[in-house]
Structure formats: structure tokens, C-alpha cells
Amino acid sequence: MAKFASIITLIFAALVLFAAFDAPAMVEAQKLCEKPSGTWSGVCGNSNACKNQCINLEGAKHGSCNYVFPAHKCICYVPC
């Protein structure tokens, strides 16, 4: 019985050691800030078109139509 416990302990220790070295490196996420699109005109009804315009014309990371009183506006997400 003691030999079985030793083997189980050794296997468990090996798994813990393997998991410690195999953990993926965490990359710090870049914070994004909202900025109203400078090139979009009118009410925003198509988030995909807004996203493409933000990325291609304004160099943003992302874009979407968001409700900003009193209407939906194209909002670009740029690095802070």
C-alpha cells in the first residue's frame, strides 16, 4: 500500500510540475477607448459598415453602432 501511495504522489507531483511549465503566457490586453467617428455622417444603422470605415479610414481597432442620445452613432475603438 505504501508503494502505491508513493507512485500516486510521484505522478501527481509530475503533473503539477508539467502544468506549471506548460501554462500559456498571459499577454496584457491593450485598453481601447471610444471615439465618435470623424468620417461617418448620419444615423448609424449598419455596424459592419461602421466597423469597416473605422478600421480602413480612421485606423481604429474596431467600430460599431452605439446608441448615444438622441440617435445611433458610429463609434470607433482606438488604443487609449
UniProtKB/Swiss-Prot annotation:
SUPFAM superfamilies: Scorpion toxin-like (SSF57095). Pfam families: Gamma-thionin (PF00304). Induction: By pathogens, methyl jasmonate and ethylene. Up-regulated by ORA59/ERF094. It comes from the Eukaryota. Residues 1-29 form the signal peptide. Keywords: Antimicrobial, Disulfide bond, Fungicide, Plant defense, Pyrrolidone carboxylic acid, Secreted, Signal. GO terms for cellular component: extracellular region. It is found in: Secreted. The modification Pyrrolidone carboxylic acid is found at Q30. Disulfide bonds join C33-C80, C44-C65, C50-C74, C54-C76. Gene3D superfamilies: Knottin, scorpion toxin-like. GO terms for biological process: defense response; defense response to fungus; jasmonic acid and ethylene-dependent systemic resistance; killing of cells of another organism; response to ethylene; response to insect; response to jasmonic acid. Predominantly expressed in leaves. Its main location: secreted. Confers broad-spectrum resistance to pathogens. Has antifungal activity in vitro. Belongs to the DEFL family. This is Defensin-like protein 16. It comes from Arabidopsis thaliana (Mouse-ear cress).
